[in-house]
Amino acid sequence: MISYGRQFIDKKDISAVVKVLKSKNLTQGPIVEKFENDLKKFMGSKYCCVLSSGTGALHLTGLTLGWNERDYVITTPISFLATSNAILYSGAKPIFVDIDKDTYNI
């Protein structure tokens, strides 16, 4: 398997997750709101909406862009399944194209 990334999770991260798991708010709640506000400030953005997955983020992107059954979206099959699924969830049709073997770009 080709390694493409690695997480850095320390004891502070684990403690924060355990704290949320023990709380009443497994989803939503004050920690999510704080994270969105902190991220918004960090990015210098007026708005921020975090999602539970990359699939959800890609789907929301398609909906925000107004993709529908009349749209075709170019993508590569050398990606996570979420990429093409989000296109389909938005009503558009994925068009698969080759990528450059050296850069992995379309």
Sequence positions of predicted segments:
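Conserved PLP-binding active-site segment in aminotransferase class I/II-type PLP enzymes
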Residues: 1-64, 68-69, 89-90
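PLP-dependent aminotransferase-like
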Residues: 63-106
